[in-house]
Amino acid sequence: FHAAALSQLNYFWPTVAGDSAPTLVDNKVRLLAHASDTVGLRLDTAALRDVAAEIEWRKTTMRSIEQYAHAGRPPAARLPIDALVDLQRAYEKLKDERRALDFEDVLLACAGMLEAEKRVAAAVREQYRHFTVDEYQDVSPLQNRLLELWLGDRTDLCVVGDASQTVYSFAGADSRYLLDFQHTHPQARVVRLERNYRSSEPVVATANALMRGRAGALELKASPAVVRAIEPTDPGAVAGSGASAPATATVTAYPNDAAEAAGVARSIRAQLRAGAQPQDIAVLYRAHAQSLDFDSALAAEGVPTTVLGGKRFFDIPEVRQAVMALRGASVAPSQGDLVRDVRDVLRSLGMTDEPPTAGGALRDSWEARAAILRLAEDAASGTTLRTFTDELQARQRDHHEPTRRTVTLSTLHAAKGLEWVHVHMVGMTEGQLPISYASGPEQIDEERRLAYVGVTRARASLSLSFSRFGGRGPRDVSRFVQETGIRTIDADDAVAIRGGRPPRGR
């Protein structure tokens, strides 16, 4: 949406307004900091980010500042509503003075231009006839309005979505557009895609148990092809070992957070020893703060990790340094052996043949350089160092990153759209999932959908875990775990369920 709207604004603005299009705000938080100074507020970065999120919600739901003031939103950045409104007005004033637009303004301005300028709308509709919208459950009122303006009175529209994966309501997403699609487009053909080609039967059964009876929920069925590919002939077989991965869905209880992190790390180490590949394993959690214990526990087991949502691969200093060094080396005479040439350059930067035994920054650096070496090993025969570095720079421009052989740590939100053979969903307690501040029915439903997203990331095995005690006393297992019907195994008994699906029913 944003790319198309920005392109249309830049093209038509000079004709419509008689001057160049406004610039884009490159840092909303920084501009908000300047705005807060003008109204006498002193806010830290976290508070400014909260205010930025409120501005985004207001605009994507197509509300004016006055309407926002009466929308009944929960307090943001610990500010009273009057102060929040004043700050938003100051932010908009600063933008106007600088002739700048933020990302939400791009959609608003494009929609306004199409509504006001009939010739512009006609030109856009002449150029674009057919529209396909993916992840339609996550469109906002503003995006849907823009889509209507692009379409005009035509019906050449295909949308794809899953109401059970609506997890961005806090940012303005509204699944009603998907749920009501057949009503608003009575001539539409609806195809229910209920055959699941990713996950094993135990994973699919768990997902169905979570969402059964909810609005728009599908009753998924595991594809027989997936079942045949995943179900092992040897109960101990794991993906990557030359045999199939065990299809399991388990729930394990640990006495405390440290025990949970250590137990999950040991389980992952066992999967790796059995032949699983690190990049086929993920640890998913509700909040970023939960990653530290699991990252540390995995490091203690010697398991390399990547935290999803960190720096892009080509933004890592060691990678940037390696690309520059390879580029410099590419102008010198080559030995004709690409892998040897690349390895020599990486060794000159400090890469060793074997990875560091511990985790941390050194291991991260080694893994980043090792990923570049693997790209060289996978390059077509006859590839020169110059061609290889050209391809690296093209990847750098396009953010086309190589796969790193590491276990992934990720929030549930960041994991959406991805998949792994083995998924460990951790911290499955009341207060963590659902999160403590999810109080009303709509917020709890959003948390349920987030749990569903996590469950459906798993291809073969799904491990849910929780700790019975935390820093503030005993914890209750998540209602979502209880609804799956999977029997909870205490950590000491967990070995009893390896290689198969545990009994359902507690």
What are these regions (language model features)?
Residues 3-13, 165-169, 199, 307-330:
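Short alpha-helix plus adjacent loop in nuclease-associated cores
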Residues 24-27, 75-180, 192-199:
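Conserved helicase NTPase motor core
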Residues 1-53, 59, 75, 179, ...:
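Conserved P-loop NTPase-based nucleic-acid remodeling module centered on helicase motor cores
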Residues 134, 160, 193-195, 250-256, ...:
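Conserved RecA-like ASCE P-loop NTPase motor core of nucleic-acid helicases/translocases
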Residues 153-156, 162-164, 185-190, 245-249, ...:
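Short glycine-/polar-rich loops that comprise or flank the Walker A/P-loop
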Residues 73, 77, 291, 295-297, ...:
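Conserved helicase C-terminal RecA-like lobe
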Residues 489-506:
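Acidic, low-complexity intrinsically disordered tails
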Residues 141-253:
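Conserved RecA-like helicase ATPase core segment
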